[in-house]
């Protein structure tokens, strides 16, 4: 559970000075928000996770191991319900704030989202892209593509997909 991130620079995964680069889940996106297990409050981890979505949508969350599936199913099947739409919009806005901060700091050539964040992007792509564009310098001056992960497994797939893309595009080129 949680929000992960990865940065690929020149085809290599950047891990930072102590291996903890891009702990994006602990960016504050709501200073008065939910308490986080890190000791902070309003971290991306707890403000944009399936539990936050389900409770904001006024749904009773089931077992923790199925929260992601419950949230995704709810987005796909009941998005027109006012509580579901309001919850999705709140999470999209918080996710957009976090992504805008990353865009300002890193100026990435793209952002790839998996899990619930992919589902939120697919539910309302215009809203998420607008929040990132409105809140980031690079978003206003040029478009940073925000893309859904195309792989089905959610743990670090966005970063892995990006890191392996050159190999998938031209396998022989990596041998030279």
Functional labels for PLM-detected ranges:
Residues 1-52, 159, 167-175:
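Phosphate-binding/catalytic loop of phosphoryl-transfer enzymes
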Residues 32, 44-176:
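ATP-binding/phosphotransfer module of carbohydrate and carboxylate kinases, centering on a glycine-rich
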């Amino acid at each position: 559970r949680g929000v992960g991130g990865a940065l690929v620079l020149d085809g290599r995964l950047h891990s930072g000075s102590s291996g903890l680069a891009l702990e994006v889940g602990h960016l504050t996106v709501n200073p008065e928000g939910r308490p986080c297990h890190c000791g902070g409050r309003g971290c991306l981890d707890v403000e944009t996770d399936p539990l936050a979505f389900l409770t904001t949508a006024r749904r009773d969350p089931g077992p923790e191991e199925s929260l992601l599936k419950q949230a995704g199913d709810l987005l796909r099947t009941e998005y027109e319900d006012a509580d579901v739409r309001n919850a999705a919009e709140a999470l999209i806005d918080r996710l957009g704030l976090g992504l805008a901060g990353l865009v300002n700091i890193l100026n990435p050539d793209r952002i790839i989202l998996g899990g619930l964040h992919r589902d939120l992007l697919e539910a309302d792509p215009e809203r998420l892209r607008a929040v990132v564009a409105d809140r980031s310098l690079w978003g206003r001056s040029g478009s940073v593509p925000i893309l859904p992960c195309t792989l089905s497994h959610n743990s670090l797939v966005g970063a892995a997909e990006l890191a392996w893309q050159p190999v998938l595009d031209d396998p022989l080129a990596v041998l030279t």
